[in-house]
From Swiss-Prot:
Keywords: Cell membrane, Membrane, Olfaction, Receptor, Sensory transduction, Transducer, Transmembrane, Transmembrane helix. Residues 1-39, 91-138, 230-269, 327-365 are cytoplasmic. This is Putative odorant receptor 69a, isoform B. Belongs to the insect chemoreceptor superfamily. Heteromeric odorant receptor channel (TC 1.A.69) family. Or49a subfamily. Expressed in olfactory sensory neurons in the antenna.
Length: 393
């Protein structure tokens, strides 16, 4: 098994939106140069994603609520605000993916070096690889299904209106966005807006999935190493003449893992903060919009709500598993037969135990930990906001 095997799905989402693929020393498959057509697809998606932010703001600015029911108008604004949350997260993730490409590739180089050292040892690589692949495969299938439904909904609604002998077509695009051309009442303008949002949605979903998978990738690699470190600590025989050398190696190994985990944390600090804070507000708006529209549109908002929930759950799940796995180091050191070692061995083991007193956890700028506890707190806050807004009806 190679480190590259863990990057199957991240590479797949890069290919879907023609995003630049990450490379590092030791990767077997070489980087495929994108031709002109692929670069055009990428830039169409990126430009439309950036414009989508502007279009949502302009739609809210130009919207006239005087001719509508106040509650319906509020639901429409909530729908626009929730979509703006999606595009903000996607745009920032795209910026991070491109601007920190070299930094992430350097991290991948270091994880590759560590992986080459352990792949022939008794590490549970296959166990963690299966767990990781199963999780992101299910996430990939759900996101793909959501994208297909989201982008096909305008066409399906127009076909239904056409065959139901409706006197006037709705011309409803994927999300309420302002465009500098006529959309309502214009077939070419309608399909142009739908095409723009298809490119925007494709890039948005692929970038968000890539960042989500990359966080899970780094998390599962750290889990493999912390688990292997704990298992090696348990098997050290303090009576062995080479025990001090083995323990010294593990102390250096543990220090390197903590440094790598800190670098990963610093790389995703902004992502953690934006994702958790934006999702709290967007979940409230999506839940409110879901209760105000027809079945097809409500299902679209339900999928959006589930996308935000699974996006944050995936990050917090990875952080929680890292906490649990890194927490194995201290018990492994304690239950080692240290009492049969000499004084130098005991002092060295004490150094490692002091560093492993608390399990390692990712944090958002040293504030809230990235864990299921924080995830549940964000859901609770979103629900409180939803009940408050819903009571206004």
């Amino acid at each position: 098994m190679q480190l590259e095997d863990f990057m199957r799905y991240p590479d797949l989402v890069c290919q879907a939106a023609q995003l630049p693929r990450y490379t590092w020393n030791g990767r077997r498959s070489l980087e495929v140069k994108r031709n002109l057509a692929k670069r055009i697809i990428f830039w169409l998606g990126a430009v439309n994603l950036v414009y989508h932010n502007i279009g949502c703001v302009m739609y809210g600015y130009f919207g006239d609520g005087r001719t509508k029911d106040p509650i319906a108008y509020l639901a429409e604004l909530a729908s626009v605000a929730s979509m703006l949350g999606f595009t903000i997260v996607g745009t920032l993730n795209l910026w991070k993916m491109l601007s920190l490409k070299t930094h992430f590739e350097n991290l991948l180089n270091e994880f590759e070096e560590l992986f080459q050292l352990i792949k022939h040892r008794a590490y549970r690589i296959h166990h963690y690889q299966e767990k990781y692949t199963r999780h992101i495969r299910n996430t990939f299938i759900f996101h793909t299904s959501a994208v297909v439904y989201y982008n096909s909904l305008p066409i399906l609604l127009m076909i239904r209106e056409h065959f139901s002998n409706s006197q006037q077509l709705g011309y409803r695009i994927q999300s309420n966005t302002w465009y500098p051309w006529q959309v309502q009442g214009s077939i070419p303008g309608f399909f142009a807006a739908v095409a723009c949002q298809i490119f925007s949605c494709q890039t948005n979903m692929c970038v968000n999935m890539f960042i989500q998978f990359l966080i899970n990738f780094f998390g599962i690699q750290l889990e493999i190493h912390f688990d292997g470190l704990a298992r090696q600590l348990e098997t050290i025989d303090a009576r062995n003449p080479h025990a001090k050398d083995q323990l010294k190696y593990l102390i250096v190994y543990h220090t390197k893992l903590l440094n790598l985990a800190d670098r990963v944390n610093r790389s995703f600090n902004f992502t953690f903060l934006i994702s958790l804070s934006v999702s709290m507000i967007s979940n409230c708006f999506l839940a409110f919009s879901m209760t105000m529209f027809d079945f097809g549109t409500s299902l679209k908002h339900l999928l959006g709500l589930l996308l935000f929930i699974t996006y944050n759950f995936s990050m917090c799940r990875s952080g929680t598993h890292l906490i649990l796995t890194s927490g194995k180091v201290l018990p492994a050191a304690f239950y080692n037969n240290w009492y049969e070692g000499d004084l130098v061995y005991r002092r060295m083991l004490l150094i490692l135990m002091m560093r492993a007193t608390k399990p390692y956890m990712w944090k958002t700028y040293k504030l809230a930990p990235v864990s299921i506890t924080t995830y549940m707190a964000t859901l609770k806050f979103s629900y409180q906001m939803f009940t408050c807004v819903r009571s206004l009806k």
